[in-house]
């Protein structure tokens, strides 16, 4: 989108409605038909980014499979989503700084990750930690690897990725 491209090029602090309109090839006034101001536009954008991430976790998810297989699917979904969407990967830190982004993330209840954690904890498989901490110890490794792989020449063969998936899974087990 125009917002993603502008953010990647200039950073979220340098965005203006005029620059976004130019990037989108529309008149500046047109944007104001949809958004009162830059903050509202960025908040809606933050909702969109988070919704895309939630949809990524859901892709090909099958809760009838063993918990590790469910976890592997979510990890791979994140990995491949970030490989296919390098602009999102480039903008991750900026997304986190968007107005209300943290609140948007916290206010989403019953998301796939939370449900997975509750069910796996109930089954006695996962450590009794918050969903946020479990995420940082596990699925966040996919995000960190994808981000660092852009700058460091990792040899990320499928067997290495599988090893990372298994090790990050063990990190959150009881």
Spell out what each predicted region is.
Residues 44, 48, 58-84, 135-138, ...:
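Hydrophobic alpha-helical connector segments
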Residues 2-9, 52-60, 137-148:
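Solvent-exposed, amphipathic alpha-helical segments
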Residues 116, 167-174:
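C-terminal alpha-helix
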Residues 2, 6-40, 44:
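Helix-turn-helix
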Residues 9-13, 85, 123:
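Short coil/turn segments at alpha/beta junctions that flank glycine-rich nucleotide-binding fingerprints
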Residues 51, 77, 98-123, 128, ...:
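Amphipathic alpha-helical packing segments from all-alpha helical-bundle domains
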Residues 76-100, 144-151:
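Amphipathic alpha-helical segments used for helix-helix packing
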Residues 38, 45, 49, 53, ...:
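Hydrophobic/aromatic residues within well-ordered alpha-helical segments
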């Amino acid at each position: 989108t125009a917002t993603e491209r502008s953010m990647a090029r200039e950073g979220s602090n340098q965005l203006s409605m005029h620059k976004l309109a130019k990037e989108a090839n529309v008149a500046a006034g047109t944007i104001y038909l949809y958004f009162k101001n830059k903050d509202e536009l960025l908040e809606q954008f933050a909702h969109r980014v988070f919704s895309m991430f939630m949809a990524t976790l859901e892709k090909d998810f099958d809760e009838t499979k063993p918990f590790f297989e469910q976890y592997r699917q979510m990890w791979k979904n994140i990995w491949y989503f970030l490989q296919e969407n390098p602009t999102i990967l480039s903008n991750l830190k900026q997304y986190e700084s968007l107005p209300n982004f943290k609140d948007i993330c916290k206010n989403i209840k019953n998301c796939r990750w939370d449900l997975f954690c509750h069910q796996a904890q109930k089954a006695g498989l996962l450590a009794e930690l918050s969903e946020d901490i479990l995420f940082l110890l596990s699925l966040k490794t996919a995000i960190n690897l994808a981000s660092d792989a852009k700058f460091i020449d990792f040899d990320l063969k499928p067997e290495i990725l599988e090893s990372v998936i298994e090790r990050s899974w063990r990190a959150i087990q009881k």
